[in-house]
Amino acid sequence: MLYYVPRREKSYMNIKPHLFGLNRSNRDFSLRETWGKNQFNSSFPVSLCCYMSSKGILANYLSIENAEIKCSSIDIKDVFEIEPENENTFFAFETSHSIKLTALPDHTTCDLTDADFGSEIVIRPDSIVYLACSLAEILKESLANCMDIPNNVDHLDWSEPKQVIPLFPHILSTLNNLCSRADTIQTPFLLQPVWKTLGKSPRLADNCLDIFIWSDVAFVKFILEISNLNVNVLSINRQTRTAIWLYKMLVDIVKYGRFNHHKIIDLCSYNTKNDKAFASSGMITNVFMKSERLERPIIMKSEIKNIILGGGQELLSPERRFDAIIYNSSELFR
């Protein structure tokens, strides 16, 4: 007996798992371990950038304009400083840019309107190290002109808040000086892709993906805005500590031509763990990122199949969280 077996329109049986645009990189996407959370969360955003570039879609650019953080547009090739589609382009992960894949909305904004949705962003100490290096690379010898360094800086005990808090006017002056140089020095620094869900549900919104790029100077301004550099403070929070880290790194670059980031971060801990520099909730980030494309991301969920290719989704290993399983198992309560 003969049977008619319809031919499948698409098959990835003979196609290796891969991500759009990442044909040459230091990651092998045919291996399951390459699809683990830590690597996928940086690989996918870069692939998304390549996909958007192939469609002629500009990324959102958070940069300094008239002393304020503004959201404009930037070509992906200007972010990477190379043509993403070029067959000779090689993507070396863990090098040039910080990448922070963020969910939209977070728990502080999920009950608000879409226009007020925001993403929590968690910044690790390494990102502040990269920020200091980026500023030093761009400014070179002129970095010293931006620095407000007191004469007694070499004699300070940086681990002691009572000695560091009087430095706040100098830190404030330095960060403001850097922001005032935005027209000549700012460059793309941090990639913040957003993925949007329907409120706090696990379902993707129809328009669910977009890319926001922070310039290095805009990120300095962001740190400045969320820090409390008032000399009357009684303690140093994470945001303010981050401003201190950045200032100390830049001071050491000017004075010694280098800095020891491990020593600075350990010395300036102020009784707070160093696992992260700081975290800012969606209520805070929305103020700086608010835009039409934050409210309605430009890439549709139906396009994800054009980015994750060759059955790569089957190699993903999402975290198993008990609260998420309970939340998605409504039948348990019937």
Swiss-Prot record:
Catalytic reaction(s) noted: Endonucleolytic cleavage of DNA to give specific double-stranded fragments with terminal 5'-phosphates
Enzyme nomenclature, EC number: 3.1.21.4
InterPro entries, per database record: Restrct_endonuc_II_HindVP
A biological process from GO: DNA restriction-modification system
Any coiled-coil regions, as ranges: none
Pfam families: RE_HindVP
Any one GO molecular function term: type II site-specific deoxyribonuclease activity
Keyword Nucleotide-binding part of the UniProt annotation: no
Keyword Protease on entry: no
Role played: A P subtype restriction enzyme that recognizes the double-stranded sequence 5'-GRCGYC-3'; the cleavage site is unknown.
UniProt protein name: Probable type II restriction enzyme HindVP
Originating organism: Haemophilus influenzae (strain ATCC 51907 / DSM 11121 / KW20 / Rd)
